Amino acid sequence: RGQTFFFHVYFRPATHTLEVADELRVGGVVVIEKYTEVLSQYELEILDVRRGRGAWLCETNQGLKLLREYKGTIKRLDFEDQVFTQLEEAWHPFVDRYVRNREGELLSSADDGTRWIVKDWYADKECNLKDDKEVLRAITQIASLHKMLREIEFKEEWNLGSILVQLPGDEMERHNRELIRARSFIRNKRKKTEFELCVIGNYDMFYEQAKDARLGMKEFCAYHGDEECYLCHGDLNQHHILMCPRDVAVVEFNRMHLGMQMEDLYHFMRKAMEKHDWSLKLGNSMLETYSRILPLSDTDRTCLYYLFLYPEKYWKQINFYYNANKAWIPARNIEKLKDLELQQ
């Protein structure tokens, strides 16, 4: 409110350097946007610049690029870039590869010390989870990505905190402790809200299911944890799968880690099946489509079983309640809790 954006872009064709740029006017004071000084560090001819969600979308002579502030480590960037290099040598995937600046660096700094990255981007729409064909196209690409990631040998230098994550059994154990803590808080309240009464009414059923899933997954990880660990995307959902005319792009690898690839498949399948009222036909089609590219072993299917068994949506609702304003819970959250009980 009270902010007006003015876009003025000029070029030096000989050097492909952005000269002047976007102005942000606040209270009559003009502040030059940082993206101009950052883009001038790249061998790119800028044709157009527009704001995206938390980033700048840049039309260039080398295609669409995305400019975003970066707050991670250089080691993390190097890890992702090395993986992209190996993927491209074997597969030529549609991914959001980082662009190096004139100095050959992945990171560029603005005068105020902020650090920025530029990467390849796609103007195509996100995967529509309500469209079976798009869902199965996405599954094909997920399987292809997983197959190629399995060929990449994990390097000792990649042993970073963001790459070595909790196994799902340990994560379930932590979530169960959070469920117990929230239930104890609710039971000790004298006057309970409708949401809290709903939790008291169905907690035992969901918690027993959570315990069974945790026990099964812990045993699974104890026997198969090491042998089932490969590089995973880490955040696969419809927002990170873009439907290009000739292929399917997978973007935002900032949570890529060493773990169980079935977690990637589970998260995407769950999102899709929720949109289709848990259609068994669609679920089987997704598994068959994945298996045509990367056959699912009995071990993979066991892992998927325990992931689906865990009442993740229930935990999310309870955890949201416990960490938010407990005095007021939106009616929609109460409906979600009741819907979860009906789906059992």
Where are these regions (language model features)?
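Regulatory N- and C-terminal appendages and interdomain linkers associated
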Residues: 4, 26-45, 205-208, 334-344
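Active-site acidic catalytic loop and adjacent metal/ATP-binding pocket
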Residues: 57, 98, 214-263
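A glycine-centered beta->alpha junction motif in the catalytic cores
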Residues: 116-129, 181-188, 310-326
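ATP-binding glycine-rich phosphate-binding loop
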Residues: 37-59
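ATP-binding pocket architecture of kinase catalytic cores
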Residues: 63-157
